[in-house]
Amino acid sequence: MAPNLRKSHPLLKMVNSSLIDLPTPSNISSWWNFGSLLGICLMTQILTGLLLAMHYTADTTLAFSSVAHTCRNVQYGWLIRNLHANGASFFFICIYFHIGRGFYYGSYLYKETWNTGVVLLLTLMATAFVGYVLPWGQMSFWGATVITNLFSAIPYIGQTLVEWAWGGFSVDNPTLTRFFALHFLLPFMIAGLTLIHLTFLHESGSNNPLGIVSNCDKIPFHPYFTLKDILGFTLMLLPLTTLALFSPNLLGDPENFTPANPLVTPPHIKPEWYFLFAYAILRSIPNKLGGVLALAASVLILFLIPFLHKAKQRTMTFRPLSQLLFWVLVANLLILTWVGSQPVEHPFIIIGQLASLTYFAILLVLFPIIGTLENKMLNY
């Protein structure tokens, strides 16, 4: 019999073992679709970003007009830009759902996979931040100024570090140039980290909604899950194109239609919606260094999740108390997101402080306690 190239070719057999003949639990739900959706998001963003970079000029005097030129004069430039800007929002929607699914179903017990995933999230956040600066509108400029300024809160080396990052004494041309370089580089780092993430995942195989070993009941990835993933792609690309074509500026800030002006500060400086929860936590602490530490902790806390798992069951499928707490956490994050978009005045200040406190309390205190309580209730 002739050798099967798919299984014998050095490169194809790697693709085969990770995308075609991969043994997959038969009962994984649609919540497991978001990993592949993130892959599609990354490819879309790299492609549209590459096309945008061909028409972009990383110079403070030309950046804003080069983006306007792309939208007005380049064939389908408006579409490429709208897909890229809104694609970032969908990227974050998918990654937040993906993390939520991992949290709900105890996937974080695959520690290496989880930790590389958190590193991927941090890299994605860095990429989105430097990318938002590139159009050089008012919110781009002031967002860059406010966030980079936070590094000055680091004792002793802070101010030097900030000036080194800026390449001067304020956000200016050198800052824009290096942010463009970083925005070009980081997505390829994300692609590399994704391969590491998948390598660790395929060491153990996928988790499933029951959280039990499913080796006795696995099915090949192709055709079952390739088809399911294609359905997922369609269901994601449909709202993305709808948003990009009908209301492309819905999620953007109107302030960014004004070219950057260091002499005029916008009334409300706020980041894109996907950073608002962290921004609300940052603002809820009246001390600069304390706020920076809380901001860092709000994301870095994900590294601690595997160590805070006290329940004897892996998933929350049969743990109603943990489920309740999980949805309280989701509601809490939505409140933080809303508060982050509001001005710093009563009652938003106190709401933000309470929501920030609740966020850390749920993750660090309540989840381990509830897990232990459920063990007692189930006589484990």
Curated annotation (Swiss-Prot):
UniProt-listed Pfam families: Cytochrom_B_C, Cytochrome_B
Protein name as annotated: Cytochrome b
Gene name tied to this protein: MT-CYB
Subunit structure: The cytochrome bc1 complex contains 11 subunits: 3 respiratory subunits (MT-CYB, CYC1 and UQCRFS1), 2 core proteins (UQCRC1 and UQCRC2) and 6 low-molecular weight proteins (UQCRH/QCR6, UQCRB/QCR7, UQCRQ/QCR8, UQCR10/QCR9, UQCR11/QCR10 and a cleavage product of UQCRFS1). This cytochrome bc1 complex then forms a dimer.
Note: Heme 1 (or BL or b562) is low-potential and absorbs at about 562 nm, and heme 2 (or BH or b566) is high-potential and absorbs at about 566 nm.
Cofactor: heme b
Localization terms from the record: Mitochondrion inner membrane
Note accompanying the cofactor annotation: Binds 2 heme b groups non-covalently.
Binding residues for heme b b566: H98, H197
Keywords, alphabetical: Electron transport, Heme, Iron, Membrane, Metal-binding, Mitochondrion, Mitochondrion inner membrane, Respiratory chain, Transmembrane, Transmembrane helix, Transport, Ubiquinone
Gene3D superfamilies: Cytochrome Bc1 Complex, Chain C
Organism expressing this protein natively: Halobaena caerulea (Blue petrel)
Described function: Component of the ubiquinol-cytochrome c reductase complex (complex III or cytochrome b-c1 complex) that is part of the mitochondrial respiratory chain. The b-c1 complex mediates electron transfer from ubiquinol to cytochrome c. Contributes to the generation of a proton gradient across the mitochondrial membrane that is then used for ATP synthesis.
Positions of heme b b562 binding: H84, H183
A cellular component annotation (GO) from this entry: mitochondrial inner membrane
Entry's family note: Belongs to the cytochrome b family.
Transport keyword on record: yes
Its membrane topology: Multi-pass membrane protein
Binding-site list for a ubiquinone: H202
Ranges that cross the membrane: 34-54, 78-99, 114-134, 179-199, 227-247, 289-309, 321-341, 348-368
